[in-house]
Amino acid sequence: MMIIGIDPGLEFTGWGVVSSTNSQSVCLLDSGVISTRGISRESEKLYKIYVSLLSVLSLYKIDEASIEKVFINSNPRSSMSLCYARAASTISVMSRGIDIYEYSSTAIKKCITGNGMAPKEQVSFMVRSSLGIKQDVEINNHSSDAIAAALCHVYNTRNRNFALK
């Protein structure tokens, strides 16, 4: 099963594609960041996120997607921007007929690290450890968070399938 994880953001949208086999192994196939820095119009940023994710989705036979839920913070403007980026990401995935699953950042962190309030560095460390990614391989926080979302879905799917047996 191939899963794409998405960490939406208006400036930086992280993505990570993992493959999970029946033998319980998971491997990272690819990851990256869609940057909209230098683009001033919000509509153009959203379009770039949409088109760039479509491009990534065309490279792999993705079975399911996992995306971080939006949390509402004290700054309404940044919350709205995050909602827009999430919508552009969701539409990209849904337009390919791929089921998308949503997890809160707390649920993702708890699943990956055991601590729902874990700092980004701890999430990144556990992502690297879980997938055997060497320290010299560059993965930024946006990609790491997206990979964590994908791993969270893999682990939750395994638990659901185990419970059904």
UniProtKB/Swiss-Prot annotation:
Its cofactor is Mg(2+). SUPFAM superfamilies: Ribonuclease H-like (SSF53098). This is Crossover junction endodeoxyribonuclease RuvC. The keyword Hydrolase applies. One of its GO terms (cellular component) is Holliday junction resolvase complex. Keywords: Cytoplasm, DNA damage, DNA recombination, DNA repair, DNA-binding, Endonuclease, Hydrolase, Magnesium, Metal-binding, Nuclease. One of its GO terms (biological process) is DNA repair. Its EC number is 3.1.21.10. Binds 2 Mg(2+) ion per subunit. The keyword rRNA-binding does not apply. CDD domains: RuvC. The active site is at D7, E68, H142. The gene is ruvC. It comes from Anaplasma marginale (strain St. Maries). InterPro entries: RNaseH-like_sf, RNaseH_sf, X-over_junc_endoDNase_RuvC. Homodimer which binds Holliday junction (HJ) DNA. The HJ becomes 2-fold symmetrical on binding to RuvC with unstacked arms; it has a different conformation from HJ DNA in complex with RuvA. In the full resolvosome a probable DNA-RuvA(4)-RuvB(12)-RuvC(2) complex forms which resolves the HJ. The RuvA-RuvB-RuvC complex processes Holliday junction (HJ) DNA during genetic recombination and DNA repair. Endonuclease that resolves HJ intermediates. Cleaves cruciform DNA by making single-stranded nicks across the HJ at symmetrical positions within the homologous arms, yielding a 5'-phosphate and a 3'-hydroxyl group; requires a central core of homology in the junction. The consensus cleavage sequence is 5'-(A/T)TT(C/G)-3'. Cleavage occurs on the 3'-side of the TT dinucleotide at the point of strand exchange. One of its GO terms (molecular function) is crossover junction DNA endonuclease activity. It comes from the Bacteria. The lineage of its organism: Bacteria, Pseudomonadati, Pseudomonadota, Alphaproteobacteria, Rickettsiales. It catalyses: Endonucleolytic cleavage at a junction such as a reciprocal single-stranded crossover between two homologous DNA duplexes (Holliday junction). Mg(2+) 1 binds at D7, H142.
